[in-house]
């Protein structure tokens, strides 16, 4: 796929991210990274940090890794509950502590808010600041798979509003740059809780190749919106001629949005 798209793009302007699941269970991430680096593509990973020790981090950096995101979903009890592993919190914190010492890599921490960690967000904020975290993204959990069947993973409307106000407070305070995730239009909170006005880039400027080869705008989007599969379709052809549901927004031009130029 990379060699197919290379004649059509400026590699310096295309970011490749390995996510999961857990990216670091792959032993060949560095080999893939070196090939991307050879072709001058910046690349990064999203990780739970459990497998990220000093040796592995040095190996990733030597392979040209530009960015990394670490998931930390609350203080120890809440994080380990969500991850289902009593060592997860320790692994994530150790990974964050290592990254705080690095000067050349772009990195941040993401937190998925749920009923188990909601009450500890203020405490978690202070803990992240103490660890040296500068950038913190806060997500809610999309209700699919296990999340749709586990009430503790969902927050209510009042809690959601509190989170937006909390992020706004963090940004005004200036001790850590907090942002809400990319999902959803936020009404009057737009422009206050993240760095840009909401616009979903799935199928517009981003695409995903999933574990089975499916071509999607984003891993969070349902399978019935997949556009093809790299094992039987040309990625460039799919990109140039597919994604019509993503790019044609006429269905949204109604009511107060009828005359929108976006």
Where are these regions (language model features)?
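Short, solvent-exposed turn/loop segments enriched in Gly/Ser/Thr/Pro and often Arg
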Residues: 21, 181, 262
């Amino acid at each position: 796929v990379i060699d197919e798209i290379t004649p059509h793009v400026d590699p310096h302007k295309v970011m490749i991210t390995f996510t999961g699941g857990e990216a670091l269970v792959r032993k060949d991430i560095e080999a893939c990274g070196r090939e991307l680096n050879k072709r001058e593509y910046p690349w990064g990973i999203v990780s739970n940090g459990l497998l990220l020790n000093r040796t592995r981090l040095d190996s990733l950096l030597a392979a040209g890794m530009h960015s990394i995101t670490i998931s930390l979903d609350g203080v120890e009890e809440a994080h380990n509950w969500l991850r289902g592993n009593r060592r997860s919190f320790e692994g994530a914190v150790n990974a964050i502590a290592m990254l705080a010492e690095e000067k050349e890599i772009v990195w941040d921490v993401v937190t998925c808010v749920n009923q188990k960690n909601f009450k500890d967000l203020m405490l978690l904020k202070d803990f992240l600041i103490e660890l040296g975290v500068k950038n913190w993204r806060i997500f809610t959990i999309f209700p699919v798979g296990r999340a749709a069947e586990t009430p503790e993973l969902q927050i209510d409307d009042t809690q959601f509003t509190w989170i937006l106000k909390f992020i706004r407070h963090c940004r005004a305070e200036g001790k850590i740059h907090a942002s809400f995730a990319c999902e959803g239009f936020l009404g009057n909170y737009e422009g206050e809780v993240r760095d840009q006005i909401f616009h979903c880039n799935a199928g517009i400027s981003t695409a995903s190749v999933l574990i089975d080869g499916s071509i999607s705008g984003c891993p969070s989007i349902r399978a019935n919106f997949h556009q093809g599969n790299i094992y039987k379709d040309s990625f460039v052809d799919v990109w140039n001629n597919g994604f019509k549901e993503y790019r044609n927004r006429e269905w949204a031009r109604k009511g107060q949005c009828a005359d929108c130029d976006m």
